[in-house]
Amino acid sequence: MSTSKAITLTLFITTTLLASCDAAANATTKPLFPAILIFGDSTVDTGNNNYPLPTIFRAEHFPYGMDLPDGKANGRFSNGKLISDIIATKLNIKEFIPPFLQPNLSDQDILTGVCFASAGAGYDDLTSLSTQAIRVSEQPNMFKSYIARLKGIVGDKKAMEIINNAFVVVSAGPNDFILNYYDIPSRRLEYPFISGYQDFILKRLENFVRELYSLGVRNVLVGGLPPMGCLPIHMTAKFRNIFRFCLEHHNKDSVLYNEKLQKLLPQIEASLPGSKFLYADVYNPMMEMIQNPSKYGFKETKRGCCGTGFLETSFMCNVFSPVCQNRSEFMFFDSIHPSEATYNVIGNRLDPLIRGKFQA
């Protein structure tokens, strides 16, 4: 073979290999969904409560957000990313999900999805009466405004295509039980047994996701309850002993609720053509972290990183609060909300389940 032919063949093979690598890379990085849409409470609120709302449940002040790239608080109740941001990143949609009430949203923000969640919200409207958050039942109204803007950008047909194929995260529930049943028993007269209140909440959840379906949503991840008896603030409020053991009867309530939710979601899916619903288990990963903290790099699971870690959250966790040096060693950032390290563990668990369900 002549030298010129050898060079030509080498260049051809090299070009082909590079093209194959580029194609493989594009296949790997291509988003599984065109957009991500978030509904719920403070576990997924990326900053809606920063904007004109008469609520004290805000996180636009230090030390919240201290481990974000710019080190600035932006409304996320953690030291860094929330679980919704982590999911969006793993799905190659975007790094951070902006709140819908943010006034300077770009068209690209709208095209790839936003957050409608509000810290302090719950499925029970009574929850937001005390927190002044945007009720979960009100969040579809924000979604309708989003759809209108999306249609203005890409037209009606393309907008509904994006909505139909978007990935939707719904995360709420703990506020309902803590505020209306455990700490302030306002619902106990109506529901003397916790199972009755659970059924009420699950019916509210079902009505909510059915409304989202009527607006075009098809792919939904629904979060279960965490081990509520292990939340630092809850252990403080129900103080039993100096060792701060989890409140097992409240954890059992979480388990029962989650079992009911896991049975409900397939029933909803079967009744809504073209829909896919996936249960997000946060209870078991969190219990594993509590029971075997060193496996996940944690040294503290019974209190938050901010202040004493027993009570501080929202306005009580502020610029004057001492903050732990190694946030990755704390399971909770404040007395309620997980640290970014915890959300990363949960995100790693959920990612293959999401791909398995929605790529099928």
From Swiss-Prot:
CDD domains: SGNH_plant_lipase_like (cd01837). Glycans are attached at N26, N104, N326. It is an enzyme of class 3 (hydrolase). The keyword Translocase does not apply. It is found in: Secreted. Its EC number is 3.1.1.-. One of its GO terms (cellular component) is extracellular region. The keyword Secreted applies. Gene3D superfamilies: SGNH hydrolase. PANTHER family: GDSL ESTERASE/LIPASE EXL3, SGNH HYDROLASE-TYPE ESTERASE DOMAIN-CONTAINING PROTEIN. This is GDSL esterase/lipase At2g31550.
